[in-house]
Amino acid sequence: MASLSSNLKTLMTSVHINASELARRTGIAQPIIHRLSTGQNTNPKLATIKPIARYFMVNISQLIGEEPLPSDQSPQITGNYRAWNRVPLISWKDATSWPEALPHYQTSDEVMYISTDANVSKLAYGLIIQGCAMEPLFPNGTTIIVEPERKPKDRDFVVVRLQGEPEARLRQIITEGNDRYLKSLNPELEKLEVARLAQEDQFLGVMAQAKVDFLR
């Protein structure tokens, strides 16, 4: 019976790509692709191999060797990858040390990735909103895509770390003259939060996209 590593090598060879290119096209980190193709990781997470199977248009059982690879047709790949990027889903705490925390996410098999068609850099990441401060526009559980390379402008939604706080938060930035303020959105809060931006506060990125899943 074929193994995951041998099947992966066969599939990459059939479409003339290497591990680096497969990583670029699927969003799976190159070191992880390397460990899979060399047999160093024989028990990967489903979230790791699912994008690979989708890219090569095979099912999971075929990819890992439980079923034979299709032999009655030419090798196929999905053509949908070109318009999409995949970014790591990180914690609000890790957002405060991004991109220094990036190497951990690039080498971990536990990382979840989310797809986006937003025009973002390789340093972009995803966060899941917690709490009701930004409702009704961004309800609890909304996934946001954050671009750390973009400078914020008036009315942008930004991820920011306030002085002395261990985690980041999402707020809207309001500019009035030379002053800038951070605003929550929920009108049902006892006190709508509008805080003047202090010099010690740290911008961590601008929200590029928000995604809400209604079926969980």
Swiss-Prot record:
One annotated GO biological process: negative regulation of DNA-templated transcription
Matching InterPro entries: Cro/C1-type_HTH, Lambda_DNA-bd_dom_sf, LexA-like, LexA/Signal_pep-like_sf, LexA_repressor, Peptidase_S24_S26A/B/C
Residues in the DNA-binding region annotation: 19-38
Any one GO molecular function term: sequence-specific DNA binding
Alphabetically ordered keywords of this record: DNA-binding, Transcription, Transcription regulation
CC terms in the record's Gene Ontology section: protein-DNA complex
Sequence ranges assigned to domain HTH cro/C1-type in this UniProt record: 8-63
Official protein name in the record: Uncharacterized HTH-type transcriptional regulator CBU_1416
UniProt organism field: Coxiella burnetii (strain RSA 493 / Nine Mile phase I)
